[in-house]
Amino acid sequence: DSEFELSKSYKPNKADWLDGTWTGFKTASFDARRGKTSSNEKDIKLIAKEIHSIPDEFTPHKRIKKIYNDRYQSIVNEKNIDWATAEALAFASLLADGYGVRLSGQDVGRGTFSHRHAVLYDQENEERFVPLRHFRKKQGLFEIVDSFLSEFGVLGFEYGYSQADPKTLVIWEAQFGDFSNGAQTIIDQFITTGERKWLRMS
């Protein structure tokens, strides 16, 4: 019973969740969690041109070249902007500001429904080119990783990555909705309860 009595006067040490690489961050208020995510039109159109430009010495598949041209024109014409184009612009806007973006999951480079095409392959020499990694001389690091089919392990790793590098947007994409079932323990025990239960942000 002595240990039980001692527990009544227990005071925890200071939480260290905002030390180290998290120095300078603070817990956001309810309203601040919505964030300011807008970009001005001029910047968006410049970024669109940069991320849809393929080097002359690179030979993409002709269909991929058409997709990239169509995406860029949708921005110029402000019409029929699809999900993949908007996603690429969002990622690029963060990268242009010096933040990192890391995307992992099964088949994320191409996109499960052949919609993303974030990784291109030269049709003559099979060299790999990632436009979001090379659109500016000074930009944040863009990583895109086709992970293996172990959702629990992969999401656990990505969650840890997000804690180690708070200035990188870390995204795990389940290939199909029910694939997230394999990672449900990580979702329940860490992602949705991390701040309250473990005093850890992500």
Predicted regions: what is each one?
Residues 1-202:
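Flexible, glycine-rich loop/tail regions that form catalytic "lids" or insertion modules at the edges
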